[in-house]
UniProtKB/Swiss-Prot annotation:
This is Ribosomal RNA small subunit methyltransferase G. It comes from Xanthomonas oryzae pv. oryzae (strain KACC10331 / KXO85). NCBIfam families: rsmG_gidB. Coiled coil: none annotated. Pfam families: GidB.
Length: 212
């Protein structure tokens, strides 16, 4: 399947969503190529439980991109990225970022390598590893995690990767009062942004945590 094989409403929904997020609709072309590849591989390898391409636009692409206004340039590690979410959409729309896609599942890592090759995406690489086993201490300005663990759990497995003063950006549903209260020593909640994801009902929050 190529992006031309996706139904026209999929492309239209993505373009509307990009406009709502104040992103250039020129990004629709590479995002659709990524989406088409994900749909094709998902039929065989079960990379995501979301199977409808139209739902993938909302729940994967636009949801991932909702955090991009809050990420500065630099080195970013996307922990437990699965098939590359949010890391690949962020790498597409933020070429000044250098993105490491951290994923231990071999099928998902192979898919991401193929996606990076297919998209000729030079500012991203795959690290086929568990986050806690990745030996790159203090190498990153930012960590992202979309559906990995509690804030404390994310810090436990990936906190060593972040430089002092760096930021963890974690996607959450409802405001995570208890998780924020349970942050370990040396980590402070910096900001919480309520996100508006085009087409997605329900609460979404981006929690930004700083490392001392």
């Amino acid at each position: 399947m190529n992006d031309a094989a996706l139904a026209p409403d999929v492309s239209a929904a993505l373009e509307r969503g990009l406009q709502a997020q104040s992103l250039d609709t020129a990004f629709a072309a590479p995002l659709l190529r990524y989406l088409a590849l994900l749909v094709r591989w998902n039929k065989t390898y079960n990379l995501t439980a979301v199977r409808d391409p139209r739902a993938m636009v909302t729940r994967h692409l636009l949801d991932s991109l909702a955090m991009q206004p809050y990420i500065a340039s630099g080195m970013l590690a996307d922990l437990g990225t699965g098939p590359g979410l949010p890391g690949i959409p962020l790498a597409i729309t933020r070429p000044q970022l250098q993105v490491t896609l951290v994923e231990s599942n071999g099928k998902k890592a192979r898919f991401m390598r193929e996606a990076l090759r297919h998209l000729e995406l030079r500012n991203a690489r795959v690290a086929e590893s568990r986050a806690e086993a990745l030996d790159e201490p203090t190498a990153y300005d930012h960590l992202t995690a979309r559906a990995l663990d509690t804030l404390a759990g994310i810090i436990a497995v990936g906190g060593h990767l972040l430089r002092p003063g760096g930021s963890l950006l974690a996607m959450k549903g409802i405001y995570p009062h208890e998780e924020i209260a349970a942050l370990p020593e040396g980590w402070t909640m910096s900001e919480v942004h309520q996100l508006q994801v085009p087409g997605l009902d329900g609460e979404r929050h981006l929690v930004v945590v700083r490392k001392a």
